Regions:
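Hydrophobic transmembrane alpha-helices and immediately adjacent juxtamembrane helices
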Residues: 1-298
Length: 298
């Protein structure tokens, strides 16, 4: 893990060039350019809000307005989109850049890394949408967030946790926690990216399988519905999903910071940081152990 970090730092200029190139290439030829970073989450929100809130009538509490629930969904969609995009693109990044790996001495660990950083930057472009929505509800005096906070951030065993004044921060101060959450998210995502990109060279079907697994993972994460639906489904048979789902821990931590201006709950962010470190260590180690075989496998 340490060697990978040192290598990335040693090639930081190349890494930066790849990130800049990727950000520019995302919307090349588009008249709206980077505005798609804002529009795309809104379009996704419109689809999922229509399906889950209006058609399926998923409720987040009697006092939760449709507008407030839309902001709650948007916070989750923004984080998940960055994660899913990175995992999907990283899986096939070595194959797509085989010409670089085969012909020159190229630091291949840069490839999953620049995709991770690019997606995080793209995610941060969409974060102001959430903050603007929160500012609107504060200005309007919307109280619906209070109920969804105590409802969706309850303990995994089903007991509701009162956020309490001791955990409440001003929104401006809570924004200082975003870099920490992004760093943890980046480590977790990059670890997965390193593992899957190397595995895909041995099993080329990995890339296709990942798309299905990511979709299943998305619907198994409380992004479009409250936690209680998982805890109460079939008498609580699926409550274990919350206990083993790191993305649930991460998304709820982001919601605490973005929507409520609060500290992330320790029983959520603590395990996520541990899993992120372990995932990055294992993923980068597997990647490095197979690195010398990449040219032959390609």
């Amino acid at each position: 893990m340490i060697r990978t970090i040192k290598d990335l730092y040693a090639h930081r200029r190349l890494l930066r060039e790849f990130v800049v190139r990727d950000l520019k290439a995302r919307y090349v030829g588009s008249s709206m350019g980077f505005f798609w970073s804002v529009i795309f989450p809104l379009l996704n929100l419109a689809v999922y809000f229509f399906v889950f809130r209006l058609i399926m009538e998923v409720r987040f509490g009697d006092k939760m307005s449709p507008e407030a629930s839309a902001m709650w969904m948007l916070a989750g969609i923004t984080v998940w989109t960055a994660f899913a995009e990175t995992v999907s693109r990283s899986t096939n990044c070595l194959v797509e850049n085989s010409n670089l790996i085969q012909k020159v001495v190229f630091p291949s660990e840069v490839l999953p890394a620049y995709l991770t950083i690019s997606s995080l930057i793209n995610m941060m472009i969409g974060v102001p949408l959430v903050l603007l929505g929160v500012g609107f509800f504060i200005w309007r005096g919307e109280a619906g967030f209070v109920e969804v906070q105590t409802a969706s951030l309850g303990a995994i065993d089903g007991q509701i946790l009162d956020p309490g004044p001791d955990r409440t921060l001003r929104w401006g101060v809570s924004m200082l926690l975003l870099p920490f959450l992004m760093l943890a998210q980046g480590g977790f995502t990059l670890g997965i990216g390193y593992f899957l990109s190397a595995l895909n060279l041995f099993l080329r079907d990995t890339y296709h399988l990942v798309g299905v697994l990511v979709t299943f993972w998305m619907f198994g994460t409380p992004i479009f519905y409250p936690v209680q639906m998982v805890e109460q489904a079939r008498g609580g048979q699926f409550a274990f999903i919350l206990k083993v789902n790191p993305m649930h821990w991460l998304i709820e931590s982001y919601r605490e910071v973005l929507l409520f201006g609060s500290w992330p709950q320790l029983h959520l962010i603590g395990p996520f940081v541990g899993v992120a470190l372990l995932t990055f260590a294992l993923g980068s180690s597997f990647f490095r152990s197979q690195k010398d075989r990449f040219p032959d496998l390609l």
